[in-house]
Regions:
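Intracellular alpha-helical coupling/juxtamembrane segments of multi-pass membrane proteins
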Residues: 246-289, 293-300
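ABC ATP-binding cassette signature C-motif
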Residues: 1-258, 309, 313-414
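Alpha-helical segments in transporter systems
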Residues: 126-127, 275-278, 285-288, 306-314
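Active-site phosphate-binding and catalytic loops of NTP-dependent enzymes
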Residues: 298-302, 306, 376
Length: 414
């Protein structure tokens, strides 16, 4: 029996349909990669499959009783929750009991705690958890937190972007899902975590639909590729390499068919312009066919071309871009940068790598002057024009129109 069926689905924002009577079926054990251009509707489709978003028309059927995990592209978490509380929050009605049991257990270890009151509450919680047979949920939550190398007592608000992504994956996997929906699961993850996630998904019997732009991840994990292209879903068995070969042929066939259609339409347009009124009356069927051809051509959505982007170098800066001298930075007891020195010069292209939570973003902010070092000095060069794209895109005004963000104060982009 299928785990999921999407039937005759339509969804539009504005005048362009993201889904145009789309069809999709997910069978047990499949790992389907959902691909397509940015903005084509992949995340909207995944939200609809997860029951987090509504379709304009059509339906989503899920196997009754199926356990489902969903990880959105930017998971929303309460920053005041602990990692353990955030993970068990996805476990339904027992989540509050488990979170309180975890909190009371830790409170008993605090100096000056009211042991008698806390012990009474702990016994009451134990009884409720036993009545709901919920101990397996706690052990599963602890196992998955450990597998993702997270501190169960850490506050969500203190986590790095990569650690928050690990947390979202842990929350989804803690319910041992039959169906897993993942939107950009490799975003913010370090190289080791991506490789670990690949092995986890490949070895799992769970049915998976995932969105990613990571080609290696696509090739290793997927058993089927589904492309969302101009509102329709094109399915291709196998991995991304197999899909690329098939897609090239599909695009060639489409181009040939469109060229034939356009040539025939042009011939009919010539005929209708040259024909006298009497001929049009005798050939009413041909006139009606031409009108239908015009409607079909107007409805056809041609494939978008590739973006051509040229970056201006701007005003030439000094040779020195930034210099850090014996810089150190800590957060509480955790040392992130220790006695670090470097010099960045004009034209350098540097890749900064390291495990999640190691301090890569902190180092960038130290270089930019957004953070002050605890020790040492950080200075920027002269005549710099800095473009900073942070992982959470906080520099973007989400209420502004797109044209105002890309080209403020101008009516066009050159």
């Amino acid at each position: 029996m299928p785990h999921l069926i999407l039937s005759d689905a339509s969804l539009a924002f504005g005048h362009v349909p993201l889904l145009d009577h789309a069809e999709f079926q997910l069978d047990p054990g499949e790992r389907v990669a959902l691909i397509g251009r940015n903005g084509c509707g992949k995340s909207s489709l995944l939200r609809a499959l997860a029951g987090q978003g509504a379709l304009d028309d059509g339906s989503v059927w899920r196997q009754p009783g199926i356990r489902m995990g969903y990880v959105p592209q930017e998971p929303p978490f309460d920053p005041e929750l602990s990692v353990f509380e955030a993970v068990v929050a996805g476990m339904g009605e027992v989540s509050a009991l488990l979170a309180e049991y975890h909190a009371v257990s830790h409170a008993m270890a605090e100096p000056g705690a009211d042991q008698a009151t806390l012990l009474d509450r702990l016994h009451a919680l134990q009884g409720e958890l036993e009545a709901r047979q919920a101990w397996s949920f706690e052990s599963q939550a602890e196992r998955v937190i450990q597998r993702f190398s997270l501190d169960p007592d850490a506050r969500v608000g203190t986590l790095s972007g990569g650690q928050k992504k690990r947390l979202a994956l842990a929350q989804a996997l803690a319910v041992t899902p039959d169906l897993l929906l993942l939107d950009e699961p490799t975003n913010h993850l370090d190289i080791g975590a991506i490789e670990w996630l690949e092995e986890l998904l490949i070895g799992s019997p769970t049915s998976i639909v995932f969105i990613t732009h990571d080609r290696r991840f696509l090739d290793r994990v997927s058993t089927r590729i589904v492309e969302l292209d101009r509102g329709r879903l094109l399915s291709c068995p196998g991995n991304f390499s197999a899909y690329q070969a098939k897609k090239e042929q599909i695009l060639h066939d489409e181009a040939v068919a469109n060229a034939k259609f356009d040539k025939f339409l042009a011939q009919e347009e010539v005929w209708i312009r040259k024909g006298v009124e009497a001929r049009r009356t005798r050939n009413e069927g041909r006139v009606l066919r031409l009108e239908q051809l015009r409607r079909e051509r107007a409805a056809r959505r041609d494939r978008q071309g590739k973006v051509e982007l040229a970056l201006d170098s701007g005003e030439k800066s000094g040779k020195l871009v930034a210099e850090l001298t014996h810089v150190s930075k800590s957060f509480g007891d955790k040392g992130v940068v220790r006695d670090f020195s470097c010099r960045l010069q004009r034209g350098d292209k540097i890749g900064l790598i390291g495990p999640n939570g190691a301090g890569k973003t902190t180092l960038l902010r130290l270089i930019l002057g957004e953070l002050a070092p605890d020790a040492g000095t950080a200075r920027l060069g002269t005549r710099l024009q800095v473009a900073y794209f942070d992982q959470f895109r906080t520099q973007l005004d989400e209420e502004a129109a797109l044209v105002d963000v890309i080209s403020p104060g101008s009516d066009y982009v050159e």
